[in-house]
């Protein structure tokens, strides 16, 4: 469950290390985002010579949450931290590699690129 002011790790090689959620997209008073939701983020920490700079405002898709994802069979997939993958204005990933596992809930036509780049799909 990601809300405004939540800090997230970045799970790609775009150059950002940490981002902060500034808005949950999809509805005028939407409070929380979960795995597969698009959020607006600002870069809080970045590496030198990366594709993104500190202070930049971008879109991101949430790929891992501490809260977890409940599956229809009753199982819960939970992670150690919150992570996101940065997106450009066309909702395509900025980075060319994805680090760490992602969940099967991302498997729709919008995020198949992230699924194919991920080392592990849970």
Swiss-Prot record:
InterPro entries: Ribosomal_uL14 (IPR000218), Ribosomal_uL14_bac-type (IPR005745), Ribosomal_uL14_CS (IPR019972), Ribosomal_uL14_sf (IPR036853)
GO biological process: translation
GO cellular component terms, A-Z: cytosolic large ribosomal subunit
PROSITE patterns: RIBOSOMAL_L14 (PS00049)
Cell membrane listed as a keyword: no
Gene that encodes it: rplN
GO molecular function: large ribosomal subunit rRNA binding; structural constituent of ribosome
Function of the molecule: Binds to 23S rRNA. Forms part of two intersubunit bridges in the 70S ribosome.
Protein name: Large ribosomal subunit protein uL14
HAMAP family reported for this sequence: Ribosomal_uL14
Quaternary assembly: Part of the 50S ribosomal subunit. Forms a cluster with proteins L3 and L19. In the 70S ribosome, L14 and L19 interact and together make contacts with the 16S rRNA in bridges B5 and B8.
Keywords: Ribonucleoprotein, Ribosomal protein, RNA-binding, rRNA-binding
Signal peptide positions on this chain: none
SMART domains registered for this protein in UniProt: Ribosomal_L14
Top-level taxon: Bacteria
